[in-house]
Design a protein with these regions (language model features):
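Glycine-rich phosphate-binding loops that contact phosphosugars or nucleotide phosphates
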Residues: 46-187, 247-248
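Acidic catalytic cores of enzymes that act on phosphate-bearing nucleotides/polynucleotides
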Residues: 15-49, 65-67, 171-174, 185-280, ...
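Gly/serine-rich nucleotide phosphate-binding loop at the start of the catalytic core
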Residues: 1-11, 291
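Short, structured coil segments at secondary-structure junctions
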Residues: 139-141, 340, 407
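C-terminal amphipathic alpha-helical interaction region
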Residues: 312-313, 317-318, 346-350, 390, ...
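Catalytic-loop motifs flanking and including active-site residues across diverse enzymes
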Residues: 63, 156-160, 224, 256-260, ...
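A generic structural motif
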Residues: 75-78, 120-128, 146-152, 231-246, ...
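Glycine-rich, charge-decorated loop segments at or immediately adjacent to ligand/cofactor-binding or catalytic sites
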Residues: 126, 130-142, 347, 353-361, ...
Length: 430
């Protein structure tokens, strides 16, 4: 068999590492989740409200951002207290999406929503079989939809994680069935994917790929950025997804891009389906949320100055911990850093922890500027927790800062009230 035929057949021995044997379910999603499945699911969904909120991170929410047709669906992929304070939960359907069922942002926002107006009968849970989230959803009387456990989050756009939110985002069953038909696995889509991967120039284990838009403000670019960064960025190698002018890929190219990303990882000799460095900061978050740690607020050691990081000769990334509305404001800041430093990417925290965070810590060396915007809202204690959203948001920033320092990344932190203040700091350093 040729390599293309082996890929179409789902041969796990094509890939480095040991995860492929249980991670190739996405190759059959277009058939498994076609018209009959969509019709059955549509009949189960609660439809009491016009507004729908989706709580999810990484691959559990980025497909929804790509497919969303505003204003039908609002995606809350954050722990930012200002965004949460500004969100009206009463009178909305809530979709809670998490493969593992243990994602901290999802758990805390779900708890918050259920005591701030969301009724269990208006709750839709999307998760893998056997998770604690599935059990909780059943106990609450929510609509629980089980996903494919043999598919990683970033490869789940054509599964329930992408399709169910799309049904709330203006797509009809017929339109989604046609989308699945356009993404059927055949020889043509495999050949196009291999050609797309072959077109990416890779030098010493590093390449760049235009994602066709600004991931901080464009849902399709955000989805594509995660797919490339998390699939390839490990073992010191990786493809850097860079903002582009567009047009980006369309929904009919989802399977082709899944295949191309996996093949790029094969060319780099890395496991396409693991994300070893994503867990690095997650573990430290919970340590920092312990009462003693919150009270001490110990600074992260080893942090560099802004000037030193701007002088770093490699590529740069901006990690901005602020409200979701700040995503629209990142382009001028990214452009200012790029004018001085060259290739620069930017996105919001903690969103990036579930996507490009793998690339930042596991991929090619990068200069990191972490921006923390001071929340304007009053602290809000999370239902059933001993900490607030302010505590969680800052703990996530601190944990990733420490993780970046621990792997030798040059990283600076800037604390400010607005993006304009940060722009002024960059300008002052010439």
């Amino acid at each position: 068999m040729s390599e293309a035929e082996r890929l179409a057949a789902g041969d796990p021995t094509l890939f480095a590492g040991s995860t492929a044997a249980t991670a190739l379910g996405w190759l059959r999603h277009s058939s498994a989740y076609g018209g009959p499945w969509l019709s059955t699911i549509e009949a189960r969904l609660p439809r009491r409200h016009e507004r729908t909120l989706l709580v999810g991170m990484g691959g559990s929410s980025s497909p929804a951002r790509m497919l969303s047709r505003a204003p039908f669906l609002t995606v809350l992929d954050t722990s930012n207290p200002d965004t949460i304070a500004a969100t009206e939960f009463d009178g909305a359907t809530l979709i809670v999406a998490s493969k593992s069922g243990t994602t901290v942002e999802v758990q805390t926002l779900m708890a918050h929503a259920l005591v701030n107006g969301v009724e269990p009968e208006d709750l839709v849970v999307i998760t893998d079989p056997g998770t604690s989230l599935a059990a909780l959803g059943d106990w609450l009387g929510a609509t629980v939809i089980l996903a494919d456990p043999h598919t990683g989050g970033r490869f789940s756009a054509l599964s329930p994680f992408g399709l169910v939110p799309a049904l709330y985002a203006g797509w009809s069953v017929t339109e989604l069935a046609e989308l699945q038909d356009a993404n059927q696995l055949d020889a043509g889509v495999v050949e196009r994917a291999l050609a797309r991967a072959a077109a990416v120039e890779i030098v010493d284990g590093v390449g760049q790929l235009d994602v066709g838009g600004d991931p901080a403000a464009n849902g399709t670019a955000l989805w594509f950025e995660q797919l490339i960064a998390e699939t390839t960025g490990k073992d010191g190698r990786g493809i850097i997804p860079v903002p582009g002018a567009g047009p980006g890929p369309g929904p009919s190219e989802i399977l082709e891009l899944h295949l191309a990303a996996a093949w790029l990882a094969r060319q780099l000799g890395v496991d396409p389906f693991n994300q070893p460095d994503v867990e690095r900061a997650k573990r430290d978050v919970f340590v920092r949320l312990m009462p003693d740690a919150r009270d001490q607020s110990t600074p992260v050691a080893g942090v560099a100055s802004l000037g030193a990081v701007l002088d770093y000769p490699g590529y740069h990334t901006l990690q901005v911990y602020g409200p979701l509305s700040a995503g629209e404001q990142l382009a001028p800041l990214r452009a200012a850093v790029a004018a001085r430093c060259g290739t620069t990417t930017a996105n919001l925290g903690p969103r990036y922890l579930h996507s490009t965070g793998q690339l930042h810590k596991g991929g090619p060396a990068v200069g990191v500027i972490q921006v923390v915007l001071r929340p304007a809202s009053a602290p809000r204690r999370i239902q059933g927790r001993g900490y607030t959203f302010h505590d969680l948001h800052r703990a996530q920033a601190d944990a990733d800062l420490a993780a970046l320092v621990s792997v030798g990344r040059p990283v600076a932190r800037v604390v400010a009230d607005t993006i304009d203040e940060v722009l002024a700091m960059v300008a002052a350093l010439g």
